[in-house]
Regions:
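Helix-to-loop junctions at the C-terminal end of transmembrane segments
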Residues: 94-109, 197, 312-325, 410
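Juxtamembrane intracellular "pre-TM" segments in multi-pass secondary transporters
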Residues: 27-45, 232-267, 456-504
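Transmembrane alpha-helix termini and helix-breaking/packing motifs in multi-pass membrane transporters
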Residues: 67-72, 100-104, 126-131, 186-208, ...
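Helix-loop boundary and gating motifs at the non-cytosolic
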Residues: 24-93, 98, 118, 123-124, ...
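Hydrophobic core of transmembrane alpha-helices in multi-pass small-molecule transporters
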Residues: 53, 121-122, 135-154, 351-366
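Structural signature of the two symmetry-related core transmembrane helices
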Residues: 109-125, 218, 327-342, 439
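Intracellular juxtamembrane helix-capping segments at the cytosolic ends
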Residues: 153-166, 365-380
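Glycine-rich segments within core transmembrane alpha-helices of 12-TM secondary carriers
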Residues: 90-92, 176-194, 392-407
């Protein structure tokens, strides 16, 4: 199966798994085929749950310890900005490339090969922690580019793969279970990593702590690669007709930019993420370098936001179902600019934990309401793997610009402090200049969009708690990243069930 051409996993008469000895069925007996399919399906779903835990050991380190590692390597303010900017832009381009290549190449080998490559990249981080070369920060930026490039390259193919495997009736429970496993494993690794780094700092061997942490991450990704290799793909060959569909989707995307509602939404999401990126890399700098938090305190601070985001997603889901997305977007848009200001009030560890709880609540609502909003305003019958990838590319460009600007501001902030001595009387850190600028620009973006945010007519979609909002990544500062993995039915005489990857291509999803 290729992106947007779903298999029909609910039909017991599907062909057995091609190329797999365990699915070779003698004769054409429908019962034998159904039994064979049940065996590989159960095995693959079980492997996928194990793979979630294995891969979480890597993502928990990559998404949350890169900035801390850069600070250990004595990264400059500008380099901290580039560490966020360049990998995000390259990753979005890799996602578009993956969506295109998926029309020509089988997806399972693409996923497995990229996962193995990512393992090598993380091993490179181990070597970097041990060697600590003179230009270590630049090597870190290069490895981060490859790391996030691999993550984004895998994403479209993984979604399509899972969309063809997980049966409709089990989809909500399966992804809810997978998300819980990912969350628990990630938080354990995150907290354990912070404790490990704090202990190694006390012993004067921080490099060993980072090397051990990245070695665990590499081991997790290697195990993940093996589990992905063992999983079954029921539709391994790309569909030739999808190539035409890809080009049609690009044309639809260009046409959709003439839709004022979608255009305003796209610029809003990209703009907000861009101005947030101005300060995103520097909260770690503020905690570790200015406030002298231990690595464990740094980890707990981030965990407070992440846990709050997970715990409040269901609340926001029920709230948006009842009152609509616009009111949630309004609340979150007006609260997001306040968050960096709250960071400037007190350096107390417990106070900043409370700030992160507030941040998690707001970012959870923002992520869910904007995902719902996009779902309701999207063009009909569009290939949303391509559509979402292009949307991500626009946001990545904004993040690149914002993080680069943040690095420039942070680099010039100490000089500004010297020129304007009165700033030192109420600013504990030059980084407060960055926080102040991002707060102002967040307000500007919010005030620009709010008058333009019309409540669209909601489309019928599965209830939030039953479906299939997959948390693909999480970040303490910029919020969770959500993927829709919803279910639709094609209006055909045979009533075929259509499952999609990230977003639906059919016009009207049905409640499960």
């Amino acid at each position: 199966m290729s992106d947007g051409h779903p298999a029909e996993p609910e039909q017991s008469g599907n062909d057995p798994a091609p190329g797999t000895a365990s699915t070779a069925v003698p004769g054409d007996a429908g019962g034998s085929r159904a039994q064979s399919r049940s065996l590989w399906l159960r095995r693959t779903l079980n492997l996928s749950q194990k793979e979630a835990v294995a891969s979480a050991t890597m993502t928990a380190t990559g998404d949350n310890f890169f900035n801390a590692f850069a600070i250990f390597l004595q990264a400059s303010a500008l380099q901290m900005g580039w560490l966020t900017a360049i990998p995000q832009l390259f990753g979005a381009l890799c996602q578009i490339l993956s969506a295109w290549l998926g029309n020509y190449l089988p997806r399972k080998p693409m996923v497995v090969a990229t996962a193995v490559l990512q393992t090598v990249v993380v091993v490179g981080l181990v070597v970097l922690a041990v060697a600590q070369p003179e230009q270590g920060v630049w090597w870190l930026i290069l490895l981060a580019v490859m790391y996030f490039g691999c993550i984004n390259f895998i994403q479209p193919q993984w979604r399509a793969w899972m969309g063809s495997i997980v049966p409709q009736r089990r989809r909500g429970a399966f992804f809810a279970s997978r998300t819980r496993l990912t969350m628990m494993a990630s938080l354990l690794v995150f907290a354990g990593g912070g404790a490990l780094l704090s202990l190694s700092e006390t012993a004067g061997v921080v490099w060993l702590g980072f090397a051990t942490l990245f070695a665990v991450a590499a081991t997790g990704r290697l195990i993940s690669s093996r589990l992905l290799h063992l999983m079954h793909d029921p539709d391994p060959r790309p569909h030739r007709e999808r190539r035409k569909g890809f080009l049609n989707s690009i044309r639809q995307l260009r046409a959709s930019l003439h839709d004022k509602t979608f255009r305003d939404y796209s610029f809003f999401v990209a703009g907000m993420q861009g101005v947030v990126a101005i300060s995103a890399p520097f909260f770690a700098v503020y905690m570790l370098r200015d406030l002298h938090f231990t690595y464990f305190e740094y980890s707990l601070n981030a965990i407070a936001s992440i846990v709050t985001q997970f715990l409040t997603l269901s609340f926001w889901g029920r709230f948006t179902d009842r009152f609509g997305n616009r009111i949630v977007m309004q609340f979150c848009c007006l609260t997001i600019p306040v968050i960096p200001v709250l960071w400037m009030i007190s350096p107390d560890f417990y106070y900043l934990l409370l700030v992160q709880v507030v941040s998690g609540l707001v970012w959870s609502g923002f992520s869910l309401s904007t995902a719902n909003y996009l779902y309701d305003i999207r063009p009909q019958r569009s290939d949303f793997a391509v559509y979402a990838a292009a949307q991500s590319a626009l946001t990545a460009v904004a993040i690149f610009a914002g993080a680069t600007l943040g690095g420039l501001i942070a680099a010039g902030a100490p000089v500004l402090f010297e020129w304007l001595g009165f700033l030192q009387s109420w600013m504990r850190s030059p980084l407060f200049v960055v926080f102040f600028v991002t707060a102002i620009l967040r307000t500007v973006v919010a005030l620009w969009f709010l008058p333009r945010a019309n409540e669209p007519v909601p489309r019928r979609r599965p209830k939030v708690l039953q479906l299939i909002l997959r948390v693909s990544r999480f970040n303490a500062i910029t919020g969770v990243s959500l993927d829709w993995l919803s279910v639709t039915r094609k209006p055909s005489a045979h009533k075929k069930t259509a499952s999609t990857d990230s977003f639906d291509t059919d016009p009207e999803p049905q409640d499960e």
